[in-house]
């Protein structure tokens, strides 16, 4: 029996996407999505992050592509993404439960826009080249799910005592 894979963060699994509309508060600012929070974290000047609070995920990503990255971004981005994902799920209990409900499914951020860092691109070119994505977002989501499951299990034991 093969392990279940969730390979698209759309439809019933849209909640896994950073584009999912949900409030995410990070460093005292509340954004409309995890994508906006992540893109804001690229800013050198913390006050510039406020501009991301009211924009859609698409606009946030477009702005994030144009700004000068803060020093050390390449080394820090995985940790920042983990912080954003933790904030998203710890602040939105229904989303946390939905993540837990994915069980032990492998979460793969499948895409067709050549993102082989955060996900796994399934476009014809990447498939023909045999490119294997790193699926960093999927890994971070699975780590967050594991932490949530442990917290829920500990809470259940405490309630029984």
Where is each model-derived feature located?
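Charged, low-complexity intrinsically disordered segments
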Residues: 1-161
């Amino acid at each position: 029996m093969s392990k279940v894979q969730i390979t698209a963060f759309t439809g019933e699994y849209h909640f896994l996407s950073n584009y999912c509309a949900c409030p995410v508060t990070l460093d005292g600012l509340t954004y409309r999505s995890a994508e906006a929070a992540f893109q804001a974290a690229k800013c050198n000047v913390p006050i510039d992050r406020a501009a991301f609070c009211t924009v859609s995920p698409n606009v946030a990503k477009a702005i994030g592509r144009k700004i000068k990255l803060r020093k050390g971004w390449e080394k820090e981005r995985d940790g920042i993404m983990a912080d954003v994902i933790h904030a998203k799920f710890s602040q939105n209990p229904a989303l946390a439960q939905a993540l837990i409900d994915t069980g032990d499914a492998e979460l793969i951020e499948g895409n067709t826009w050549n993102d082989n860092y955060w996900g796994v691109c399934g476009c014809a070119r990447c498939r023909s080249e045999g490119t294997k994505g790193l699926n960093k977002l999927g890994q971070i989501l699975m780590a967050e799910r594991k932490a949530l499951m442990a917290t829920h299990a500990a809470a259940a034991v405490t309630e029984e005592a």
